[in-house]
Amino acid sequence: MMKKHRMIAALACCAPLLAGAQTNDNEPKAEGKAIIAIFSDVHTGFGSNNNDRGFTLDRSYLGYQYTLKNGLQFKAVMDVGQSDDVHDYERIAYIKNALVTWKYKNLTLSGGLISTTQFKTQESFWGKRYVMKSFQDEYKFGSSADMGVSLAYDFTPWFSADVILVNGEGYKKVQVNDGLQYGAGLTFTPLRGLTLRAYASYNEASDKTLEGITNWNLFAGYATGAFSLAAEYNSQTNARNIKDHDQSGCSVYSTVGVGKHVNLFGRWDYLTSKDHWNEAADGMAGVVGAEFKLGKYIKLTPNMRVWSPKADDAKKSYYAYLNCSFTI
């Protein structure tokens, strides 16, 4: 375990060392900016969920980003939000990002507590994290940040590849056992506005009695002007490190601009598990809404949601939400 941790630490140090080799006595002036994001909502259920209502502070990000003109960037972000480890009304603060990124020509190297690449493209295309997480994040296929290193290279204007090596336990847990997660992705942009991506990863088990987790996903998205449409397919084997606990699902989402400050959007998710091992969580989810941009920093988004469980004895649930996003 110590050897693996030393390897990650050594790789994480590569970025500043390489960047230092490119500097000179007349280094350009650096620039910094604050990172602030607050996601909140008010919601109510209908029918059997009528008592589920109220205001929620879903998440807040506080951080700072410092960029040098030689391609070196430092970033630290704290995440304050809900956690399964505490009561629903309590919040826990985590360090989500603490990394160094170095960019040189077509190469990008990041080390530290970095953003993962498993569903970063999908999350960017969806563009409404404050309303609902992207599919893999929502259904726990992986974490959005982790401790490790990543490298991306643009071979051509329309083709790039990336690799990542992280602990595999996410940013909310400290690595205490052996096991790393390896991932690689390919991104194609053959036409203006069209993005195609394939990604696969393997997360080693920390114990011989457990199974390693394999993830792979395919994504296609098209965006031009005020219109975007995307679809993704996701598959995971040995979920929670348990043999044959496989699950998969797809997500389709679209946004249409109807003015400078208004967007209409919709999304449909489908989640299923092998041999119904996770039937209680299997089902279909749908959300439709309108996003109103109030100036540069604030978004208000009324939306309706439905969850249709796969289990025969489970009832559908309906909700109305008003989500708010404040970002700088």
Regions found by a protein language model. Give the residues of each.
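Cleavable N-terminal export/targeting peptides
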Residues: 1-27
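Outer membrane beta-barrel
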Residues: 23-45, 49-168, 178-180, 187-194, ...
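Transmembrane beta-strands of outer-membrane beta-barrel pores
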Residues: 40-46, 59-61, 78-84, 104, ...
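Transmembrane beta-barrel architecture of outer-membrane proteins
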Residues: 58, 80, 94-96, 145, ...
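Detector for outer-membrane/organellar transmembrane beta-barrel domains
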Residues: 177, 187-275
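Outer-membrane beta-barrel "beta-signal"
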Residues: 186-188, 292, 316-328
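Outer membrane beta-barrel transmembrane domains
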Residues: 251-301, 305
